[in-house]
C-alpha cells in the first residue's frame, strides 16, 4: 500500500505538477534541493541531487543552493546535507573542494551585507529598520546583515534572483514563517521575480512540502501582490 502511494505521488509529480510550470529544469532542481534540506529529507535529496547532476546542473550551483538555506533553516538542519552533498559529489568524481565563491571578508561582510539588503529591499526601508531596532536587539540586525546577506547573498555561483527565490522556497518549506515569506515575496518582486514565477515555484514544491505550507505560501504571495 505504501509503495502504491509513493508510485502514485511520483506519477502525479511527473504528469501533473512538472508540466504546470514555466520553471526551467535547473531552477526546479535547486528549489527542490532547498526544500528537502528544510524538510529534512536526505534520501529524496540524494535522488534529486543525482538527477540534477545528470541533467547538467553544476556542482557549484548545487552547493550554493544548499549554502543559501543555512541562514534560514539553521546550521543544525543544514550541516548533514552539506556533508551529504560532498559525499555524493565525491562519488560522482567531482574534485573537492570546489572553487571558492565567497566575495567578502571579516572586515567587509557587514558593510556589503547592508548594501545587498538595500539593493533588495530599498535603502530607506533597511536604514529605517536598523535605526528603529531597540538597543538590546541591534546586534541581531548586525548578525542578519553580515551573516545572512554579507556571507551568503554576496557569493558568486548563483545570481541574486536565484538566491532570493531559493530563500522563498526554503521559508515556504520550513513552515511557520509567514512574516518572513511576505517580506521575501516583496524581495523577489523587487529583484525581478514576478508573481507567476513564485506561483510556479510553489506548484513544484507542493507534493514535497504538503498543502498547508503551500497554501500559506500562496497566501503570502496574494497578500503582497494584491498591494502592487
Cite the ranges covered by each PLM segment.
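Single conserved hydrophobic/aromatic residue that forms the stacking wall/gate
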Residues: 1-8
Amino acid at each position: 500500500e505504501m509503495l502504491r502511494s509513493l508510485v502514485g505521488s511520483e506519477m502525479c509529480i511527473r504528469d501533473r505538477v512538472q508540466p504546470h510550470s514555466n520553471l526551467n529544469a535547473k531552477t526546479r532542481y535547486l528549489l527542490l534541493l532547498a526544500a528537502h534540506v528544510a524538510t529534512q529529507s536526505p534520501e529524496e535529496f540524494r535522488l534529486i541531487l543525482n538527477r540534477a547532476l545528470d541533467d547538467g546542473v553544476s556542482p557549484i550551483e548545487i552547493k550554493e543552493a544548499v549554502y543559501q538555506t543555512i541562514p534560514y533553516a539553521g546550521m543544525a538542519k543544514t550541516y548533514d546535507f552539506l556533508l551529504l552533498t560532498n559525499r555524493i559529489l565525491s562519488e560522482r568524481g567531482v574534485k573537492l573542494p570546489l572553487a571558492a565563491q565567497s566575495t567578502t571578508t571579516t572586515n567587509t561582510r557587514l558593510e556589503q551585507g547592508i548594501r545587498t539588503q538595500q539593493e533588495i529591499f530599498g535603502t530607506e526601508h533597511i536604514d529605517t529598520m536598523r535605526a528603529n531596532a531597540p538597543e538590546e536587539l541591534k546586534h541581531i540586525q548586525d548578525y542578519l546583515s553580515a551573516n545572512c546577506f554579507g556571507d551568503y547573498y554576496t557569493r558568486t555561483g548563483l545570481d541574486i534572483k536565484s538566491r532570493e527565490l531559493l530563500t522563498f522556497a526554503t521559508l515556504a518549506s520550513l513552515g511557520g514563517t509567514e512574516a518572513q515569506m511576505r517580506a521575501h515575496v516583496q524581495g523577489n518582486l523587487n529583484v525581478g521575480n514576478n508573481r507567476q514565477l513564485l506561483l510556479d515555484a510553489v506548484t513544484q514544491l507542493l507534493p514535497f512540502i504538503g498543502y498547508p505550507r503551500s497554501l500559506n505560501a500562496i497566501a503570502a504571495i496574494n497578500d503582497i501582490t494584491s498591494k502592487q
